[in-house]
Amino acid sequence: MSSVTTPAPVYTWTADEAIKFLKEWNFSLGIILLFITIILQFGYTSRSMSVYVIKMIILWLMWPLTIILTIFNCVYALNNVYLGFSIVFTIVAIIMWIVYFVNSIRLFIRTGSWWSFNPETNNLMCIDMKGRMYVRPIIEDYHTLTVTIIRGHLYMQGIKLGTGYSLSDLPAYVTVAKVSHLLTYKRGFLDKIGDTSGFAVYVKSKVGNYRLPSTQKGSGMDTALLRNNI
């Protein structure tokens, strides 16, 4: 005697249920979206480093969430067309996620800085101040970089790095590390403003996959490869 398989019930939302859901979750969703919008709008290294870190965490979580959703779409595809698109999107998301990790690891090997895993950019500016290497992300490799000292406070491209420095501590070269090569910027202009303030302009002078000698005597390491990053 053959058994008849009962088809699983298909649940669909009605318009009233959708409206009820929006009414119940509208306030919470609005707060969450407002929070994310503020973080993405004002999360810059030159404004607030803590807000910028939260922004990077949000961006970093976007890839795994996207992969989870695309896999979910593959498992519960509505039809073969949706299944095909879901498989393609899943493969693309996974490949881009792997490429991101490969590039981040390569940049980490070059700089030794955890900023290498920044999902926003693969450009890390590096400045060696009296043997201490500061590394910060920048959006692009500019033709010039500006380093400013205001009453002992060190700023590079508007990003505060440290305190207790003077113009005489500024190095002759700064670098921008990328995944495949290193950009060297040579100090082209220096101007003193008052007794404890001033600025220097560094101009891009060399690009290539090479090593720049360290300013630390006897360290045997490269300026863009030092491990005492901050």
Curated annotation (Swiss-Prot):
It comes from the Viruses. Keywords: Glycoprotein, Host Golgi apparatus, Host membrane, Host-virus interaction, Membrane, Transmembrane, Transmembrane helix, Viral envelope protein, Viral immunoevasion, Viral matrix protein, Virion. This is Membrane protein. The keyword Hydrolase does not apply. The keyword Nucleotide-binding does not apply. InterPro entries: M_CoV, M_HCoV-like. It is a multi-pass membrane protein. Homomultimer. Interacts with envelope E protein in the budding compartment of the host cell, which is located between endoplasmic reticulum and the Golgi complex. Forms a complex with HE and S proteins. Interacts with nucleocapsid N protein. This interaction probably participates in RNA packaging into the virus. GO terms for cellular component: host cell Golgi membrane; membrane; viral envelope; virion membrane. It holds the Pfam family CoV_M.
